[in-house]
Amino acid sequence: MNSKALLVFISLCFFFNENCAQNKLDGSGRKSGKWVFQVKDHPSSNYAENLKVEEGNFINGRKEGIWLRYHKDGKTPKLKGNYRNNRPEGFYIRYHRNSKKMEEATFIQNKYKGNCIRYYNNGKVAYKGNYNNSGEESGKIQYFHKNGKFCL
């Protein structure tokens, strides 16, 4: 077998192995391991057919670890965040449709906590703030114009 054919064969093996290793149920019928949800799994999502809506891992039927949600093109990330016991927990990033960051923040017990930065779709900072343990803005809050200059 020539090296090009061998390379194609090995690539196909990895592709099929990856696809077969996702969207599995455990012995109790709960979602387990890596899952990729497509439009058929979210019929009300208004996405075109056969595109990814979101993907991540399940443990005991609950979202755990890093999850990615996609914009309607099925490729551009919309949100990347950590889940713990089926709830957003920890650092996450939301993205504009042009792939630039929209927001960076941390969620603890379904509330903002710590630093939060929001961005315009041109990549310039729109807002910088801090959230206390109750999920309320605290301390110095800053707003910026779309050109990046501080609002007085």
Where are these regions (language model features)?
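Glycine/tyrosine- and acidic-biased, solvent-exposed loop/turn segments at the edges of beta-strands
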Residues: 16-152
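Bacterial Sec-dependent N-terminal signal peptides
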Residues: 1-23
